[in-house]
Amino acid sequence: MGVGGADWLERPERESEENVEGALNAIGLKPGMTVAEVGAATGYVALRMARRVGPAGKVYANDVQPEMLQLLRVNATKAGLTNVVTVLGSVTDPKLPLGQIDLIILVDVYHEFSQPQKMLEGIHSALKPDGRLVLLEYRKEDPAVPILPDHKMSVAEAKTEVEAEGFKLGPVIEALPRQHILIYTKAPRSSAAIVYDGDIRECWI
């Protein structure tokens, strides 16, 4: 979503529609964790994560749009949060630090990837050995979810596509009004996997 959709991302009714706080409760964020959001946009989710991991923790907020990251920095400053690092990624590389992240979340973002294999390679490399990947995706199985079909994802699709890139699907939580919560752990990547060699571009708030 482009920067023109920023107001929609920050709409007052978003919590009642999506129960973001409930999703964050379900994924086990703890003080001191290092976490990341890929496709963080305005920071609606990333800043809520920052409050949960606290001053001893860190949130890497990734996006490919500098304008979105600027809005995120403004929002973080207004919220008094100093544990957020913005990261300008690319469509092939999230540019997250290697092997340092406990949990990476994608909220209705996976379907936007033009090169999902490359992005998942970078995400896999950024996670610690026991790190987790969490996808929130609108339920394709439910025709009542008022989202365009190509913005939805079924559990079967999520399992097949993401597991092919070195992950193992674990719990699937169906407690949200419209979205799956899909939780993956790392699995060994195939010998054909491309080694992540991206640099890190950080902008401290």
Across the structure, where does each feature detected by a protein language model lie?
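A short glycine-rich, Lys/Arg-flanked "PGG" loop and its adjoining helix->strand segment in the class I
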Residues: 50-54, 117-132
